[in-house]
Amino acid sequence: MARDKIALIGSGQIGGTLAHMIGLKELGDVVLFDIAEGVPQGKALDIAESSPVDGFDANFTGANSYEAIEGASVVIVTAGVPRKPGMSRDDLLSINLKVMEQVGAGIKKYAPDAFVICITNPLDAMVWALQKASGMPAKKVVGMAGVLDSARFRYFLADEFNVSVEDVTAFVLGGHGDTMVPLVKYSTVAGIPLPDLVKMGWTSQARLDEIVDRTRNGGAEIVNLLKTGSAFYAPAASAIAMAESYLRDKKRVLPVAAYLNGEYGVKDMYVGVPVVIGAKGVERIVEIEMAGKDREAFDKSVGAVQGLVDACKKIAPDLLGR
């Protein structure tokens, strides 16, 4: 049985980390694509040379032409300009929108049946643009956002309670930015909801609010620490979880930026919500109940995403005709 082919568009920090993780998990053969000559080839060779030590079998190829991604089962897009200190995700919009148009055309021509995961920021607008540019079914194009944001929330909670991260579940919905919505009500430790843990004296509401704020600013915190780039280990791990659920038909319930067409009262936009990912792509959108402040925060987040999408429409009106 032939191995799946996984194409990585962009061979920077996230792209290289993705390639290595795919090898370690033996998810398939890897094609690293980048416009910079030598970079994808060098990283592919370096990772391939680690395979005898790490004990995995996979082929790694570096390329500067989209032809190399032909027939890929999964395409993960990291191409674009990374966020720098003091730069908001919104600042990246016009630059990375052009990148998504080029990438979308390449995927449409060479890997039209792939499951596509977008990581490029500003995420919710970029995955929307990528889907429009590629013309692919919306259920086969998703954005990596909620898995990462939820992982950060889970880690902070596990650290606060001094428990295993495996016993912490958490959901972060909405846009992948400052307006994201960490849902305390639906987050648990070994099945015990966070509000109950406050009542039990494990933490205070004020401390919980601080953790929620830290989650919202998780990406910026790392950008400010690194000073020369942005996070790549956790984003790569998050995208791998999504790709694995698709390739192995695991049907995991994961929060991702998914195309909404009426769900949650949202139309023609990508927003972070829980979905089931299986062999058909997004197989189900899970609509959970939100009320009060949670619903207000979600609606505010949707409004922020709408603003980015509207900006995309002004910059590239031709996307709407695709």
Curated annotation (Swiss-Prot):
S-S bonds: none
Gene Ontology BP term (one): lactate metabolic process
Descriptive protein name: Malate dehydrogenase
Enzyme category, top tier: oxidoreductase
Function: Catalyzes the reversible oxidation of malate to oxaloacetate.
GO molecular function, one term: L-lactate dehydrogenase activity
HAMAP family xref list: Malate_dehydrog_3
UniProt lineage: Bacteria, Pseudomonadati, Pseudomonadota, Alphaproteobacteria, Hyphomicrobiales
Entry EC number(s): 1.1.1.37
Homology family: Belongs to the LDH/MDH superfamily. MDH type 3 family.
Reactions performed catalytically: (S)-malate + NAD(+) = oxaloacetate + NADH + H(+)
Gene3D superfamilies found in the cross-reference section: Lactate dehydrogenase/glycoside hydrolase, family 4, C-terminal, NAD(P)-binding Rossmann-like Domain
UniProt-annotated binding residues for NAD(+): G10, S11, G12, Q13, I14, G15, D34, N96, I119, T120, N121
Gene name of the encoded protein: mdh
Record keywords, A-Z: NAD, Oxidoreductase, Tricarboxylic acid cycle
CDD domains named among the record's database cross-references: LDH-like_MDH (cd01339)
PANTHER family with a match to the protein in the record: L-2-HYDROXYCARBOXYLATE DEHYDROGENASE (NAD(P)(+)), L-LACTATE DEHYDROGENASE
Keyword presence, Oxidoreductase: yes
